[in-house]
A protein has these predicted regions:
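Alpha/beta catalytic cores of nucleotide-metabolism and tRNA/nucleoside-modifying enzymes
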Residues: 1-27, 111-115, 122-125, 187, ...
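Active-site entrance/lid segments in N-terminal catalytic domains of soluble metabolic enzymes
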Residues: 1-252, 258, 288
Length: 374
């Protein structure tokens, strides 16, 4: 790809966000009823190709169950309020009333409480007993400490999620997690990320991960670009990681690693764009935070917001638009892409003539001029 000269001593690639691209219609259209948007990773099949982000404003044990019943995968945050407090509801109510400008300090105080291993097992069991697929997330820093409790509780899919996760973390203070060894010794599929480059993704795929999360610095509640100066626009990031998947398949003799767009997926139109760039599914946060039954009651924040030294996120008030079911599968009563996310994906595929997600990854895209952006 051609590089642009930033100055005499620096060059850089032009990268694109989802807002920078648009999907091109083809010569064929299709009845939406003939379109399948189902997604399967390892032994688990989902009627909707998405994971609900492991954020306390989005996923509680009850919402994880509801999301599973609707065809998706809710991922529990095992470092959040449900594993620190017996009853986090009063704290969730308090957070919903916080002023955004003063919220960071209070969030840091709330999340200073220790994680209780007994609560990890109890929350996972609560979801598992409902009969839906159970997924839970830890950061790389806490994976070794709590992974046994997670597996013993019967998790189906293990998610290791951080702002950015590498296969070659260097630390003089502590022994870093050996991802390859950890995944090899685990009996459940592991999804790991985020990453945003071809090389980083290729290294993560070589660890044996079933899926790779793509993205860091994006998302409605993240301020990573402002704080650290780090971000890769999502359309380019997903396309680069999809290229790594293609090359890894050749290298490994056909092993397929799922690419999951995690960040920058704020509206229904972002989902087909993510798939068009090569994603198999998406991880959704802010759209689900707008649900009437979301734990945050329209307020949204992530673990980056509570970092004790360098917070890289904030509390945002997104408002409420409808139930979780309406947001995922409709019916919609808003014209802005905040509801019926997967009805929109189905219609986008039908409009361009595709019947399967894997086929839709080949759809033509164009770079949109600024005047055509949302």
């Amino acid at each position: 790809m051609t590089e642009i000269e930033i100055g005499r001593g620096k060059r850089g690639r032009r990268a694109y966000a989802f807002d920078d691209i648009a999907i091109v219609p083809s010569r064929r259209t299709r009845d939406p009823k003939e379109v399948s948007i189902a997604w399967q990773i390892d032994a688990y099949r989902f009627e909707l190709p998405f994971l609900a982000a492991p954020m306390d404003s989005v996923v509680s044990p009850q919402t994880a169950i509801r999301i599973g019943e609707l065809g998706g995968l809710g991922v529990l945050n095992l470092e959040g309020l449900w594993t620190r407090y017996e009853d986090p509801q009063p704290l969730l109510d308090e957070v919903a009333e916080l002023d955004e400008a003063a919220a960071t300090r209070r969030l840091q105080e709330i999340y200073a409480a220790p994680i209780k291993e007994e609560l990890i097992g109890r929350r996972i069991k609560e979801v598992r007993d409902s009969g839906v697929v159970t997924a839970a997330a830890l950061s790389p820093q806490r994976t070794a400490q709590f992974s046994k409790a997670v597996v013993d509780a019967g998790v189906d899919i293990f998610v290791i999620r951080g702002t950015t996760v590498s296969a070659e973390h260097v630390s003089g203070a502590a022994e870093p997690l050996n991802l390859k060894q950890f995944i090899y010794e685990l009996d459940v599929p592991v999804i790991v990320g985020g990453c945003a480059t071809y090389t980083a993704a290729l290294h993560l795929m070589r660890t044996g991960a079933a899926g790779v999360l793509v993205g860091f610095g994006g998302g409605a509640a993240h301020t990573t670009r402002n704080v650290l100066g780090i971000q890769v626009p999502m359309a380019t990031a997903v396309a680069d990681v999809a290229a790594a998947r293609r090359d890894y398949m050749d290298e490994s003799g056909g092993r397929y690693v799922h690419v999951i767009a995690d960040g920058g997926v704020g509206w229904s139109g972002d989902i087909p764009k993510a798939v068009a760039c090569g994603a198999d599914s998406v991880m959704i946060g802010s759209p689900l935070a707008r649900a009437t039954d979301a734990p945050g009651r329209g307020h949204h924040w992530g673990m980056e917001a509570v970092h004790e030294d360098v917070p890289r996120g904030k509390l945002v008030d997104l408002g409420i638009v409808g139930t979780t079911e309406e947001i995922l599968t409709g019916p919609s009563h808003t014209p802005d892409g905040s509801m019926n996310l997967f009805g929109a994906l189905r219609r986008s595929m039908a409009t361009t003539g595709y019947s399967e997600l894997k086929e839709f990854q080949r759809v033509e895209v164009t770079v949109a001029d600024a005047q055509h952006k949302r």
